[in-house]
Amino acid sequence: MAKKSMIEREKKRAKLVEKYSAKREALLEEFRTTESPLEKLEIHRQIQQLPRNSAPNRRRNRCWVTGRPRGVYRDFGLSRNVLREWAHEGLLPGVVKSSW
């Protein structure tokens, strides 16, 4: 089980990403289309003024059951350990153990 503080920190990051996503995307689009180096410098400064945790690449996928940060399957949002347990118990519809 992950520390509660780490799980809460990830939730806070998710909220910040949601809050600033439109502004960040608008600034990045303006940065891509602008030709003037001075304007690009100003836009870059504005992007840097945004909160650091509002960048989407600061987020970490976590298991929604245990909060484990590594070994998380995107399709289920579960860590490999929980996925294995639940699959063996038949709690994941359509998931079967492979054999050949």
Swiss-Prot record:
Q: Which domain of life is it from?
A: Bacteria
Under the heading InterPro entries, the entry gives: Ribosomal_uS14, Ribosomal_uS14_bac/plastid, Ribosomal_uS14_CS
Query: Has the keyword Phosphoprotein been applied to this entry?
Result: no
Q: Name one GO cellular component term.
A: cytoplasm
Q: Which PROSITE patterns match?
A: RIBOSOMAL_S14 (PS00527)
List the Pfam families hit by this protein, alphabetically.
Answer: Ribosomal_S14
Q: Which UniProt keywords apply?
A: Ribonucleoprotein, Ribosomal protein, RNA-binding, rRNA-binding
One biological process GO term for this chain?
A: translation
GO molecular function terms listed in the Swiss-Prot or TrEMBL record: rRNA binding; structural constituent of ribosome
Can you tell me which family this protein belongs to?
Belongs to the universal ribosomal protein uS14 family.
Subunit and partners: Part of the 30S ribosomal subunit. Contacts proteins S3 and S10.
List the PANTHER family hit by this protein, alphabetically.
Answer: 30S RIBOSOMAL PROTEIN S14 (PTHR19836), SMALL RIBOSOMAL SUBUNIT PROTEIN US14M (PTHR19836:SF19)
Q: Which HAMAP family has this protein been placed in?
A: Ribosomal_uS14_1
Task: Tell me, in a sentence or two, what this protein's role is.
Answer: Binds 16S rRNA, required for the assembly of 30S particles and may also be responsible for determining the conformation of the 16S rRNA at the A site.
Q: What is this protein called?
A: Small ribosomal subunit protein uS14
Q: Which organism is it from?
A: Trichormus variabilis (strain ATCC 29413 / PCC 7937)
Instruction: Please state the gene responsible for encoding this protein.
Output: rpsN
